[in-house]
Amino acid sequence: MKALDELVFDNRFARLGDAFSTHVLPEPIDAPRLVVASESALALLDLAPEQSELPLFAEIFSGHKLWAEAEPRAMVYSGHQFGSYNPRLGDGRGLLLGEVYNDAGEHWDLHLKGAGRTPYSRMGDGRAVLRSSIREFLASEALHALGIPSSRAACVVSSNTPVWREKQEYAAMVLRLAQSHVRFGSLEYLFYTKQPEHLKTLAEHVLTMHYPHCQEQPEPYLAMFREIVERNAELIAKWQAYGFCHGVMNTDNMSILGITFDFGPFAFLDDFDEHFICNHSDHEGRYSFSNQVPIAQWNLSALGQALTPFVSVEALRETIGLFLPLYQAHYLDLMRRRLGLTVAQDQDDKLVSQLLQLMQNSGVDYTLFFRRLGDQPAAQALRALRDDFVDIKVFDDWAQAYQARIAAEENGTEQARKERMHAVNPLYILRNYLAQNAIEAAEKGDYEEVRRLHQVLCTPFTEQPGMEGYAQRPPDWGKHLEISCSS
């Protein structure tokens, strides 16, 4: 493991030039102090965990100091926001400090969010508040622990710098890690501003740096697009299977790598509600939980439009058409596993859809249902869960079909089923009320709850003694919280 001054930089994106980003220095925040750090995220940079305890660590990730090799850049992009094209967005408060080349041969972007004003800040102050920084940190690391592809968060640094949102808050910075920060909107910007040479340069960069194996195909850009479609189908299947609602699926928030990216008013489901809207600005429900699948496909179509100089429209349409069947296959496989099933059968989609409708009608806690279903032998678990449902007879019919389905597999003991189910059904998820409790403590200067919650979320499938309070249904005030985009 390395010290902070031993990191190796190879700033590939910065070398593309000023058509793609603008050199900007971070604006430091006052009295920086570390709120929380992720040891596993820092390990991606080969950074020893004790480095986060040094004063230099907080100074670097609050904008006070920089490596000589860093080349901070604000990236330019556009995007479709709530379905309407916005011609010029860009990093309004975040900076790509540089790319670290680790000992495993990987490049990791260091993106400092809340780093101050840039040419793309529009009327904003370029700051992020402590509240949103903690939420992004916890969400990134929670999704990663669940096995859902995501950008990572290495740390949060707080300050005494006041900023105004609905009220006075304090500025913070979060260090985000990803192997690329190129978005769908990065390519859209160059396409719609009619910069064909720069569009080709960026497309080549994505192809050679992130999809090099596609270069061997007869149509490299089509092969790359197909893999992006495949990755997004798998990503959205995992969101839906684990009850994650992103909240702002604009094309500028979609990663070219098919990872969860740009956290805002996200939420995990408490009670199952397919129509759940986590963003209080989403008045029409465009980005509701159930709409995430069609919106992802719509966003892929928007990306495909930007690739029309390199791939035929017919081939792009055909590839986009693969999204839904790929999604359905991934989703059904995940839901089978959540139910403890190991063999695919034709009626599995009906078994799943009937269960979800029952949960919807009865307001059943989505996460705890699956965990409790695996806690005991099936017959006992179903009896214990029965009282959670309004229509007992319909639930009993479903339970009978489920037990028959388990019996048909004949592939092991109840203990083996329990172990299988506990390996894929988390006990701990990032419920909004848990995040809110941690934020309120942090805003008073107490960071212990953020750190404790982070540690719990790092091992979501394993029961942790003394942490029972993190595995409960939310109190009434904590249910169905809608979160503001204000950050």
UniProtKB/Swiss-Prot annotation:
NCBIfam families: PRK00029.1, PrtAdtaseSelOPseudom. Its EC number is 2.7.7.-, 2.7.7.108. HAMAP family: YdiU_SelO. This is Protein nucleotidyltransferase YdiU. It catalyses: L-seryl-[protein] + ATP = 3-O-(5'-adenylyl)-L-seryl-[protein] + diphosphate; L-threonyl-[protein] + ATP = 3-O-(5'-adenylyl)-L-threonyl-[protein] + diphosphate; L-tyrosyl-[protein] + ATP = O-(5'-adenylyl)-L-tyrosyl-[protein] + diphosphate; L-histidyl-[protein] + UTP = N(tele)-(5'-uridylyl)-L-histidyl-[protein] + diphosphate. InterPro entries: SelO. One of its GO terms (molecular function) is ATP binding. Mg(2+) binds at residues 253, 262. The keyword Metal-binding applies. ATP binds at residues 90, 92-93, 113, 125-126, 176, 183, 262. The lineage of its organism: Bacteria, Pseudomonadati, Pseudomonadota, Gammaproteobacteria, Pseudomonadales. Keywords: ATP-binding, Magnesium, Manganese, Metal-binding, Nucleotide-binding, Nucleotidyltransferase, Transferase. Belongs to the SELO family. The active site is at residue 252. The AMP-PNP molecule (an ATP analog) is flipped in the active site when compared to canonical protein kinases. Coiled coil: none annotated. Its cofactor is Mg(2+); Mn(2+). Nucleotidyltransferase involved in the post-translational modification of proteins. It can catalyze the addition of adenosine monophosphate (AMP) or uridine monophosphate (UMP) to a protein, resulting in modifications known as AMPylation and UMPylation. It comes from the Bacteria.
